[in-house]
Amino acid sequence: MVHPRQSLCSIALLLLVAEALVAPRITRRHHCYRHAAATTDAPTQWQRATPNALTALRLGCVPIVFGALRCDAPRIACGCFAGASITDAFDGYLARRWRVESRLGAFLDPVADKLLVVTTLVALTASTPGVALPAALIVAREVAVSALREYCADRGQRDAVAVGGAGKLKTATQMAALLVLTGRLAPRAGLGLLRVSAALALYSGALLFAQARPVFAASDAAPG
């Protein structure tokens, strides 16, 4: 008989994988047709608030996931992590769909993502053997890539480092691994996925630094 906790987390895992596969297609289709709807109603206040509210909800889940893992409550940790991850599939999409993108949302969305992942990794490092090394590699990669993006943005080359297929696959395996590990569904499988995610993190990070070589070269060639 399947445990209810396993059923819940399995369904959430399938939703995360489906989001990773389908959301890019939805986004591309939306960009293809967004200019065709020239006559649309102005967004309501509710529509303006919803995307940022979802992002704020994800931020609010961060201490709950951490506390649940520290208090040995895997069911709460798994469910809260799954819910927080699913909101990531909708806040950005709804903001684009309703054309209510904001600077605050653009800032908070990646912050919420990274806080959720890093905090969960820290909590798992203290309670799950074997997590420390891949967690350290993933966190180091995130710090390096964040610094790279800031460097490129300061030089007016924000689009010089674009997320590719390896980065999206890294995110999908990372979220799946953390979901399995927080719920303690299959520790060996979860640890294996986390190691794969760490390898993809290093590989995709190296690709981003390779993309940014022209920015570094232009900076070196600049006078003064």
Give, region by region, the residue ranges found by the protein language model:
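N-terminal chloroplast transit peptides
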Residues: 2-28
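A feature for the membrane-embedded catalytic helix bundles of lipid/isoprenoid biosynthetic enzymes
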Residues: 21, 25-29, 33, 39-49, ...
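Short, hydrophobic transmembrane alpha-helix segments
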Residues: 65-73
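Short hydrophobic/aromatic, small-residue-rich stretches within specific transmembrane helices
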Residues: 78-85
